[in-house]
């Protein structure tokens, strides 16, 4: 076997892609409902905000950090934006921009707490998680405008509907935007100074500082990027969820973070891939969507997802030990 073939077969992204194919085959065989177009469309709808959060949190995880505020933050921004649209007649486009601005602001706060004030990432983002959860709880349940209402056009960003009634055809336009974003952020991670410095800080922060990298600045920036994508996730969440409910963000960050680790980000930092994040999120979404079709309910879904995450992290640890030897 050539070195190139060995490299492909040992690439965790390739392994996870095989897992996606295997899971799809198993669920399709066990349930004909799983094969329906509406099921696939629904799975894609609810993967958009998970993927956006996951793309953002990939960068702090590569530096050896984490952001626990992305789930509650996403719901908080969607609630604030929706409340302004419903109660204050703020244009939807302004509310969408506000979601992004709020995400960047909380991301910058996380970055300052971690990168400049040297708080542990877990503690700093746990604090902002509590802040955003509390701020979101001050708002009531908020439906954004639906597709047939003024301002409801933003739903078409993620799902294009052609025709009316039963003859209407729906296309997952959001999937195209997700692929383009993955390509863009993979390029940023691998071919820009920001991406190279992010990897360098995760590999060895002290060595990165000695080489002239402004570690504090780039630590702040990875959390700003994470906040930006959390704000975008808030828009996607509002677009696919009929009503944004306070308190629903708790735990959503686990799917995003889990998908990043399944996709091959190093448990200790220093390496990651946005393409890997994409395939990792699809494993999580396949499990969440497919397991109910084979008779396994929510508790079992969480258990199996947890086991998959443990296996992914163990594989990464074994690979690190093997490369060290």
Regions inferred by a protein language model and the residue ranges of each:
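Single transmembrane alpha-helix segments in multi-pass membrane proteins
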Residues: 26-33, 37-88, 113-118, 260, ...
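Alpha-helical transmembrane segments within multi-pass membrane transporters and channels
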Residues: 89-129, 279-280
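Cytosolic-side transmembrane-helix boundaries in multi-pass membrane proteins
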Residues: 1-21, 25, 203, 209-217, ...
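Loop-to-transmembrane alpha-helix initiation sites
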Residues: 12, 121-123, 170-178, 219, ...
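Transmembrane helix-bundle core of multi-pass membrane transporters
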Residues: 122-192, 218-221, 241-249, 324-325
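Hydrophobic core segments of alpha-helical transmembrane domains in multi-pass membrane transport
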Residues: 16-28, 57, 100, 129-134, ...
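Transmembrane alpha-helical segments in multi-pass inner-membrane proteins
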Residues: 223-224, 229-230, 240-306
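Membrane-helix/interface signature in polytopic inner-membrane proteins
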Residues: 39, 183-223
């Amino acid at each position: 076997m050539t070195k190139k073939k060995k490299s492909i077969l040992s690439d965790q992204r390739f392994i996870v892609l095989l897992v996606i194919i295997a899971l799809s085959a198993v669920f399709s065989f066990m349930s004909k409902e799983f094969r329906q177009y509406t099921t696939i469309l629904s799975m894609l709808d609810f993967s958009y905000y998970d993927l956006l959060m996951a793309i953002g949190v990939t960068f702090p995880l590569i530096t050896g950090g984490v952001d626990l505020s992305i789930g509650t933050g996403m719901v908080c921004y969607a609630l604030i934006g929706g409340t302004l649209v419903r109660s204050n007649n703020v244009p939807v486009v302004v509310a969408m921009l506000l979601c992004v601005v709020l995400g960047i602001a909380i991301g910058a706060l996380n970055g300052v707490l971690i990168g400049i004030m040297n708080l542990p990432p877990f503690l700093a983002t746990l604090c902002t998680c509590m802040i955003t959860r509390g701020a979101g709880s001050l708002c009531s349940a908020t439906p954004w405008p639906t597709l047939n209402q003024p301002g409801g056009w933003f739903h078409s960003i993620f799902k294009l509907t052609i025709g009316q009634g039963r003859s209407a055809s729906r296309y997952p336009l959001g999937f195209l935007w997700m692929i383009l974003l993955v390509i863009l952020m993979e390029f940023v991670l691998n071919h820009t100074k920001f991406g190279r410095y992010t990897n360098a800080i995760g590999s060895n922060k002290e060595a990165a500082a000695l080489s002239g990298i402004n570690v504090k600045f780039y630590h702040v920036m990875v959390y700003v990027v994470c906040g930006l994508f959390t704000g975008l996730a808030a828009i996607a969440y509002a677009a696919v969820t009929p009503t944004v409910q306070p308190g629903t963000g708790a735990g959503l960050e686990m799917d995003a973070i889990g998908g990043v680790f399944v996709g091959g980000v190093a448990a200790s930092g220093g390496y990651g891939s946005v393409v890997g994040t994409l395939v990792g999120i699809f494993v999580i979404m396949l499990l969440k969507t497919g397991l109910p079709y084979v008779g396994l309910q929510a508790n079992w879904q969480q258990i199996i997802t947890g086991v998959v995450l443990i296996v992914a992290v163990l594989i990464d640890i074994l690979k690190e030990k093997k490369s060290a030897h």
